[in-house]
């Protein structure tokens, strides 16, 4: 009789779609029963042996005798010790209580934390080994140091040597670089069927961006200045929506996107030529990635959405790129991340 797999918790941050997308890419490679904790609604379909627990929000305003109070005004950082632990916020309390209750009742072998300093600390205080997913940028602040200190393993979803980080150097013995994690890894590219002589340009907004009417207007202005290009906007609020953009991504001549970890890993999986527009994110996350892409000549990187007249030259530069996306080590990255989790979960059986 085959022994049952370990029980693993998985905390998925609710900002944007990147953390959820990463979970969905890694999950098929992990032989375990998994319980996901997240404030997002449960997806319409889940992998086998996976359960979803919807957590209360901890970022909405509360009502006090003095009127509405936002948690950012309730000492959420504890004088710089943590990132988010607002005082007297019932949602925050119920959120952590739900995790603690499940851990106490179920005794998981490990909990993946993607991402939250407070959840990583809670998990370790309850005697369960956390596997912390880290992100690029300047993570030298005290809360990140605390999260790294309590983590049994730290998963970096990018290749070793491409993102310098003194904050991670100090925990190198527990750090595992797995490469860029893409849901499209190992898929064959789709052959483009476009109009000869016209460059196909695909715009994929970052999963955490607002997009919307302003982006649609910017794309229309760019298209007007590039008559030899055909532009397509997917998502972003006003663009077309497809559940699986792989065909469009892998067949486009040039892709315009942000510098989030999923976006970049998807570019690598497609072998795309790209114009990358880093978005403002905490801890300089996307700008750090943009600098890496520029240094490795993997993409044309610009600081902000370009003026319409700049697009002809940018598309020409991107079209001329010969990016060596093998540097991003997408192949096998999701399985390597799952192996890190499985390693930590196996300790419970010792």
Which residue stretches match the model-derived regions?
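Conserved nucleotide-sugar donor-binding subdomain of glycosyltransferases
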Residues: 75-110, 115-120
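Donor-nucleotide binding loops and adjacent catalytic segments primarily
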Residues: 27-28, 190-254, 264, 306
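A nucleotide-sugar donor-handling region in carbohydrate enzymes
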Residues: 150-210
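A conserved, positively charged/aromatic
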Residues: 132, 145-156, 249
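A short, glycine/small-residue-rich beta-strand->loop->alpha-helix junction that serves as a flexible
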Residues: 10-24, 212-213
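Conserved nucleotide-sugar phosphate-binding/catalytic loop shared by glycosyltransferases and other
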Residues: 13-14, 32-92
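A donor-sugar binding/catalytic signature common to diverse glycosyltransferases
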Residues: 110-115, 245-288
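C-terminal amphipathic helix plus adjacent low-complexity
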Residues: 312-350
């Amino acid at each position: 009789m085959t022994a049952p797999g370990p029980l693993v918790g998985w905390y998925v941050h609710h900002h944007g779609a990147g953390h959820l997308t990463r979970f969905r890419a890694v999950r098929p490679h992990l032989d375990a029963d998994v319980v996901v904790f997240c404030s997002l609604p449960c997806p319409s379909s889940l992998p086998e042996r996976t359960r979803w627990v919807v957590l209360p929000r901890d970022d909405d305003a509360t009502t006090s005798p003095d009127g509405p109070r936002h948690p950012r005004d309730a000492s959420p950082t504890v004088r710089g010790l943590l990132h988010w632990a607002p005082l007297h916020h019932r949602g925050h309390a119920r959120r952590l209580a739900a995790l603690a209750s499940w851990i106490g009742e179920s005794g998981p072998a490990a909990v993946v934390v993607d991402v939250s300093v407070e959840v990583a600390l809670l998990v370790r205080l309850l005697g369960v080994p956390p596997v912390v997913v880290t992100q690029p940028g300047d993570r030298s602040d005290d809360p990140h140091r605390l999260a790294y200190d309590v983590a049994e393993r730290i998963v970096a979803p990018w290749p070793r040597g491409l993102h310098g980080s003194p904050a991670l150097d100090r925990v190198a013995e527990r750090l595992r670089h797995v490469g860029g994690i893409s849901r499209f890894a190992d898929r064959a590219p789709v052959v483009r069927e476009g109009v000869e002589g016209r460059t196909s340009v695909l715009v994929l907004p970052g999963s955490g961006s607002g997009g919307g009417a302003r982006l649609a207007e910017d794309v229309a202005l760019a298209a007007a200045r590039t008559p030899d290009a055909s532009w397509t906007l997917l998502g972003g609020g006003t663009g077309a929506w497809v559940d699986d953009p792989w065909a469009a991504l892998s067949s486009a001549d040039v892709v315009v996107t942000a510098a989030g970890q999923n976006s970049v890993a998807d570019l690598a999986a497609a072998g795309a030529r790209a114009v990358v527009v880093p978005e403002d994110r905490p801890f300089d996350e996307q700008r750090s990635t943009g600098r890496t892409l520029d240094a490795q000549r993997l993409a044309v990187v610009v600081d902000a959405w370009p003026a319409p007249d700049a697009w002809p030259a940018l598309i020409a530069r991107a079209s001329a790129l010969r990016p060596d996306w093998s540097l991003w080590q997408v192949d096998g990255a999701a399985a390597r991340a799952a192996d890190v989790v499985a390693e930590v979960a196996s300790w419970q059986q010792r």
